[in-house]
Structure formats: C-alpha cells, structure tokens
Design a protein with these regions (language model features):
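Conserved active-site and cofactor/substrate-binding residues in soluble primary-metabolism enzymes
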Residues: 1, 5, 21-25, 61, ...
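Acidic/His-rich, divalent-metal-binding segments that scaffold phosphate/diphosphate chemistry
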Residues: 1-57
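Predominant activation on well-ordered alpha-helical scaffold segments within soluble catalytic domains
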Residues: 7, 11, 24-27, 31, ...
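Short polybasic/polar patches that bind polyanions
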Residues: 11, 31, 35, 71, ...
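C-terminal binding/interaction regions
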Residues: 14, 127-129, 134-179
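Amphipathic, non-membrane alpha-helical segments in soluble helical-bundle scaffolds
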Residues: 16, 97-100, 160
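Divalent metal-dependent catalytic cores for phosphoryl transfer on phosphate-bearing substrates
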Residues: 37-140, 149
C-alpha cells in the first residue's frame, strides 16, 4: 500500500480536523522511528496514519473496521500493529512496529495537547514540562497514561528521550501540523 492509498482510506472515514491532525502527527513520529530503527519507514508511517482511521465513523467498532479492511488487502503487519495498539483486545506485541505504535500514539497526542495550552505552542517545549503535565491526571484526562508507560517499556526506550524524540519530530513539522 502506498501512502496516497492510505491517505485515501483515512480521508474516507475521518473528517474532523483534530483526528486528522492526530493521524498526521502519529504518522510523522512513526516514520521517524522507522528510520531511527532501520525499519520500513513508509510502512511505519502508514501504520501511524491509519491506526485510528475508523474511530470517527465507527467509534463502537474501532479498530475492527480498519483492521478488517487492511487484512482484506493483505496488509497483515499493519493490521496486527493496529489491533495490538487497542489494548482492550489483548493482542500480543510481536514486532517493534507493534510496540512503537503503542509507545507513540497516546504520547504524541498528549504532547500536542501540551502545545495547545502554551502561548508559544511547540517552541521551547521540554520533556520535563511534558512529564510534569503527565502527572496532572486532570490534564488531557482521556489520555491513557498506563498505555504510555507500557509502550515505553515494551519499546525499550527511556521516557525522557522518547518525549524529546516526539517533540523534535513535531517541531520539525509544526507548520504542517499547525502547532
């Protein structure tokens, strides 16, 4: 599957600006991690892009629709990573891709939320300030902090370095992401 084909799937199911920005930000972070780990960065980017593609149109079935669609077109590895990121299914984390999606999804969204409450947005945002916000349970309360912790542990990265990596990717793409 090409990125353009993946974007067509995303845009057929997702219309809201917030979810589209989340998809784009996770796409970019996953692409960067794919390069960092010497993996197929296009596949990693597509996984990040599509991980919540069916959430807006089919919230009660998420991620069943997108997983089934991906399996039908032979994208089993991406489908498995998306299945695993939905922790309620209890799917095992078999590959680095599976672990990276879990590690990047919630924390990328959380980092964007941190930007939205700062006058200077992403500029000057530090891992220390993101970690401080993580401790405030009332801030971005829907973010699953235990999933962030589990993802970081599974991926085998340091939380501070992981946050710094995400900030760097978001900062490099701030115009595209409007942050």
């Amino acid at each position: 599957m090409t990125r353009d084909e993946a974007r067509n799937i995303l845009e057929s199911m997702t219309k809201g600006d917030s979810l589209l920005r989340h998809a784009r930000s996770v796409e970019l972070v996953m692409e960067a991690y794919g390069k960092h780990f010497g993996e197929d960065s296009e596949e990693w980017a597509i996984t990040g892009m599509l991980h919540d593609a069916d959430y807006e149109a089919y919230p009660e079935e998420h991620p069943n629709r997108i997983v089934n669609m991906l399996r039908e077109i032979g994208e089993e590895k991406i489908a498995h990573a998306i299945s695993a990121h939905y922790t309620k299914w209890g799917v095992e984390y078999e590959t680095k891709l599976d672990k990276a999606l879990l590690a990047c999804d919630e924390l990328t969204g959380f980092t964007i939320a941190c930007c939205q409450v700062r006058p200077e947005s992403i500029e000057g945002l530090t891992a220390k300030s993101v970690k401080k916000k993580l401790k405030q349970k009332s801030f971005a309360a829907k973010v699953e902090r235990d999933e962030i912790e589990k993802g970081v542990e599974l991926l085998g990265v340091d939380l501070t370095e992981h946050i710094e990596f995400i900030i760097k990717v978001l900062e490099e793409n701030r115009k595209d992401l409007n942050i």
